[in-house]
Amino acid sequence: YVSWNWKAGTTTGIAGSPSITPLGYSFNATSGFSAIKYEGTGSAGTLPHGLGVAPNMIIVKALETVENWAVYNSPRGATKYIELNHDGSEGTSAVMWNDTEPTSTLFTVNTNGGVNTSGKDYIAYCFANVKGFSKVGSYIGNGATNGVFVYTGFKPAFILVKDATSTANWILFDNKREGYNANNDILRADTDAAEGNSADLDILSNGFKANSNWASINKSGATFIYLAVAEEPLVANVGSGLPATAR
């Protein structure tokens, strides 16, 4: 088994003027992570995230109804959505995020059942980029065995990758299940499949690199989104962002 864990924090500090009052929440602006439980209203509304900066990824799940996991990511923007439990490409619809980018205090949900059915409970997980700790970003695959290098500014311990523009699994890498390069022990977040070894990926001191032309992480011309979290949540010099050393 493997477990990945995020610590939130304070249960005070709602900022802005949200139109939907959370049922419960935990904010950690230092690590750029928060969790918010809320009851849907069935109409477009705003919720607090407590991060002090606009979140770069938001994952929402209905708790009482059968709905897909809805994902917002800043590289693709609020006109798009993608589903964590499916391998499909991103969709375009205003009914998810109301075509409204998150602000430093609030994020918006519209009327889609995956994010805002009246009287039903939801949980939202928000992630903001923090230098030396976490990063949401995107890259373009090159389809070569000498694949793309992705700069994060830190040595990742956890990497979640999805081809946003094609049918492809959500691919998970970490530094515990194999622990050395090339890291090819993968899990697929959108299936119940056992661990596989389809890819070669190097975890480096300042990012990660695909050493494979495997389409799920390096399809030529495809746009990939990712969430990466650091092994050591620090930098040697905050101003210049010097990363921790390689393994």
What are these regions (language model features)?
Residues 1-247:
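Surface-exposed molecular-recognition determinants
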